[in-house]
Amino acid sequence: MKALILVGGYGTRLRPLTLSIPKPLVDFCNKPILLHQVEALASAGVDHVILAVSYMSQMLEKEMKAQEQRLGIRISMSHEEEPLGTAGPLALARDLLSETAEPFFVLNSDVICDFPFQAMVQFHRHHGQEGSILVTKVEEPSKYGVVVCEADTGRIHRFVEKPQVFVSNKINAGMYILSPAVLQRIQLQPTSIEKEIFPVMAKEGQLYAMELQGFWMDIGQPKDFLTGMCLFLQSLRQKQPEQLCSGPGIVGNVLVDPSARIGKNCSIGPNVSLGPGVVVEDGVCIRRCTVLRDARIRSHSWLESCIVCWRCRVGQWVRMENVTVLGEDVIVNDELYLNGASVLPHKSIGESVPEPGIIM
């Protein structure tokens, strides 16, 4: 079985992280976002993953080729010369996707969840039509485009953009199974599958919705990245608690790479991910943060709701909070306060940032 993952975007919402590497390779809970998806696909029996690439495609190709042998699957690149939206890439990869008559997966690369791929295959085969969409329930449907479908069968009737009166609380979760017949509906041009292809399929009775059980998050921007981390760590607590850290100073759900080092009298957690080579010195407090490879947090600093990127250096007695994001190789000098700062890569911060803003 095949899968196509849409990884061609610039990742602008997740800057400054994506100024250094493409978004699919950003570590989420100590593993590239894309690898969470590819490993789940391989476990579900997918043997050929096609990546619809454009931005920093060489870096993506190098990393994924290294994973091919480990996972025992084929990984191909489909290169976009111009942005093709969310449907155009399917037309571009038509020859690969139609090598067999089997249905195939299509995934947005921003999504993290429990990935119920085997259940999706069974659901798609059961209804026997052209397309299946994974949907998830949300608390405030007026913020989203919602999916209106039959409760018992899942057949989709229509899509409603940001409804002001309640019609549904189910939204598109960004994962689909499509039969090869869908490829005949798509031209090789910039096209939205959500706005141009799916509504037509729904009118013809060819589109069904399967409801996702468990957590789901679009982690395409920093605040949602951190929320997604919290949900993922809670899922680990329930399913693979042995992967989480425990011991003195560890509070709640904390994921620590074996090569990371934590000093004395620290308070780490809840909801913290520390990557490879990270050093946390004595007396540091970290809550609801992700700290990426080879970063160093010096003694007695306090971090809450932050993303600290590769090789950053945070000084002593620093306080950072409110979705502060440090790009790659940023230095924060001692005794500073950063409130909601977004700092571009390779900067040295010498004064406090009391109000949220971008530090160029």
UniProtKB/Swiss-Prot annotation:
Cofactor note: Coordinates binding with substrate and required for enzymatic activity. Can use both Mg(2+) and Mn(2+) in vitro; recombinant protein shows higher activity with Mn(2+) but native protein with Mg(2+). Mg(2+) is likely to be the in vivo cofactor.
Pathway(s) of this molecule: Nucleotide-sugar biosynthesis; GDP-alpha-D-mannose biosynthesis; GDP-alpha-D-mannose from alpha-D-mannose 1-phosphate (GTP route): step 1/1
Principal place of residence: cytoplasm
Region (Substrate-binding domain): 2-222
Known cofactor(s): Mg(2+)
Catalysed reactions listed for this entry: alpha-D-mannose 1-phosphate + GTP + H(+) = GDP-alpha-D-mannose + diphosphate
Assigned EC number: 2.7.7.13
Keyword Nucleotide-binding in annotation: yes
Mechanisms controlling activity: Enzyme activity is reduced by incorporation into the GMPPA-GMPPB mannose-1-phosphate guanylyltransferase complex. Allosterically inhibited, when part of the GMPPA-GMPPB complex, by GDP-alpha-D-mannose binding to GMPPA.
Active-site residues per Swiss-Prot or TrEMBL entry: 162
Region feature (Hexapeptide repeat domain): 245-360
Cell compartment(s), UniProt: Cytoplasm
Tissue-level expression: Expressed in the liver (at protein level).
Binding site for Mg(2+): 110, 218
Enzyme superclass (EC): transferase
Molecular-function annotations in GO: GTP binding; mannose-1-phosphate guanylyltransferase (GTP) activity; metal ion binding
Gene Ontology process terms (BP): GDP-mannose biosynthetic process; protein glycosylation
Domain of life per record: Eukaryota
One cellular-component annotation, GO: GDP-mannose pyrophosphorylase complex
Keywords per UniProt: Cytoplasm, GTP-binding, Magnesium, Metal-binding, Nucleotide-binding, Nucleotidyltransferase, Transferase
Residue positions binding GDP-alpha-D-mannose: 110, 218
Subunit structure: Component of the GMPPA-GMPPB mannose-1-phosphate guanylyltransferase complex composed of 4 GMPPA subunits and 8 GMPPB subunits; the complex is organized into three layers, a central layer made up of 2 GMPPA dimers sandwiched between two layers each made up of 2 GMPPB dimers. GMPPB catalytic activity is reduced when part of the complex and binding of GDP-alpha-D-Mannose by GMPPA induces allosteric feedback inhibition of GMPPB.
Function comment: Catalytic subunit of the GMPPA-GMPPB mannose-1-phosphate guanylyltransferase complex. Catalyzes the formation of GDP-mannose, an essential precursor of glycan moieties of glycoproteins and glycolipids. Can catalyze the reverse reaction in vitro. Together with GMPPA regulates GDP-alpha-D-mannose levels.
Similarity annotation: Belongs to the transferase hexapeptide repeat family.
Domain remark from Swiss-Prot or TrEMBL: The N-terminal substrate-binding domain adopts a Rossman-like fold and has a binding pocket for GTP or GDP-alpha-D-mannose. Substrate binding is coordinated by an Mg(2+) ion.
Protein name stated in the entry: Mannose-1-phosphate guanylyltransferase catalytic subunit beta
Provenance organism: Sus scrofa (Pig)
